Amino acid sequence: MTLHIHNTMTRTKEVFEPLDPGHVRLYVCGPTVYDRAHIGNARPVIVFDLLARLLRRLYPQVTYVRNITDVDDKINARASASGRTIGEITEETTRLFHEDMAELGALPPDVEPRATAHIADMVAMIERLIAKGHAYEAEGHVLFSVPSMGAYGSLSGRSMDDMIAGARVEVAPYKRDPADFVLWKPSDASLPGWDSPWGRGRPGWHIECSAMSSRYLGPSFDIHGGGLDLIFPHHENEIAQSVCCNGPGTFARYWMHNGYLMVEGEKMSKSLGNFVTVRDLLDQAPGEAMRLAMLGTHYRQPFDWTAEGLEQARRGLDRLYSALRRVAGIAASPAEVPEGVMAALCDDLNTPKALAEVYDLLGVLNRATTTEEQAKAKGALLAAGALLGLFQADPEVWLCGAGTGEEEGLAARVEDLICQRKAARQARDFARADAIRDELTQAGIVLEDGPNGTTWRKA
């Protein structure tokens, strides 16, 4: 099946044609590890996790690289304010990021380079840019000369005047042009730094991704992804550095960007009091519900995070897991991902359409009457879920929360009450049976009576 993706560079949806059909290479900008991941950080992780899963279905080998930015002024400021070391902050934040993303069903990338482990690559790249006349040293800094690249601004579509006026550009006296940006900056004794031909210092943000993508994917690769907010200046500057260093026609062939995130219709910010971390939400709802909620909106569209949307996603998963629990004793027939789901995802990751196909598959499973039909429908549904990163858990665990000692105790109490209710109904003591149902409802337990008996789930 042919994959079509929207290329930010050309502003059109194109047929994806990899440089090497035997090996697709993908780079995505990762987190700056100074604080807990918020839901805005989670969206690109989920989007490009799905893209990597899809690419692996279509091509024999995929290398997915997502970096960790562990040298940055925000990290320095957090260390200074907290009294902790930079290493303590970055190690802890990276670990927590991994834990949070795993709960969202995101698979780890194939390579996750840290900026601090690739300073030598950055220094070498800066040296080449200086040698080619695209960068210059000034007062301990090294800056990229934006006017030296005639095609600068091609990704964002901005003119030089627009970029200077719209960007928060530090117009320092040592800059030859106001748009020039930092590749290397000096560090005093209080800041992290590495020896370089220009003295002790640290890299600028943009050179980090250029160096790491080239290190692991080569000077030219297939797809570069990230959030819409990174188009300018970060991705624009990555292109400038990489193309001027490695030559015309190099760097990423396709650019993919996910849309902005809102919270209850407003921009997320600490000043508005609606800053939500992934952990905040994981304390309230399963990560799988968060994943489904995000997949319900096309990745290029703005996503409005709402409590109602999260609840709808949870209810949708309840329906899916309830159906899977009803056929728990039937082995799923081996199945490929259904064509409708694949076609939707190959159409620029059209997840709303793919999920509509999933709910159609759910209907097929619910209508199946023979064991053969149920096995086939179950296999198709699970295959679709495996690609989407959904409903791969034990239905009993999802619906009833089995696992911990406390949850097992709850399950035992519920099962006992279900037995009492069954006995009351057999004795035609319907008042007692209804009272038990009401008691369970008040405890957040939903009963579902079926031809094979009564099952239950948490509301």
Swiss-Prot record:
Entry's EC annotation = 6.1.1.16
Binding partners and assembly: Monomer.
The UniProt record lists the keyword ATP-binding: yes
Q: Which GO terms describe its molecular function?
A: ATP binding; cysteine-tRNA ligase activity; zinc ion binding
The cofactor binding remark recorded in the entry reads: Binds 1 zinc ion per subunit.
Keyword terms: Aminoacyl-tRNA synthetase, ATP-binding, Cytoplasm, Ligase, Metal-binding, Nucleotide-binding, Protein biosynthesis, Zinc
| The name this protein goes by in its record | Cysteine--tRNA ligase
Q: Which reaction does it catalyse?
A: tRNA(Cys) + L-cysteine + ATP = L-cysteinyl-tRNA(Cys) + AMP + diphosphate
Q: Where in the cell is it found?
A: Cytoplasm
Location of motif 'KMSKS' region in this chain is: 267-271
InterPro entries membership: Cys-tRNA-ligase (IPR015803), Cys-tRNA-synt_Ia_DALR (IPR015273), Cys-tRNA/MSH_ligase (IPR024909), CysS_C (IPR056411), Rossmann-like_a/b/a_fold (IPR014729), tRNA-synt_1_cat_dom (IPR032678), tRNAsynth_Ia_anticodon-bd (IPR009080)
Record keywords: ATP-binding included? yes
Pfam families associated with the record: CysS_C, DALR_2, tRNA-synt_1e
For this entry, list what GO says about its biological process: cysteinyl-tRNA aminoacylation
Binding-site residues, Zn(2+): 29, 209, 234, 238
Coiled-coil stretches: none
Family per record: Belongs to the class-I aminoacyl-tRNA synthetase family.
Binding sites annotated in the UniProt record for ATP: 270
Q: What is its main location?
A: cytoplasm
'HIGH' region (motif): residue ranges: 31-41
GO cellular component, alphabetical, reads: cytosol
Which cofactor is essential here? Answer: Zn(2+)
Task: Name the source organism.
Answer: Rhodospirillum rubrum (strain ATCC 11170 / ATH 1.1.1 / DSM 467 / LMG 4362 / NCIMB 8255 / S1)
Gene name of this polypeptide: cysS
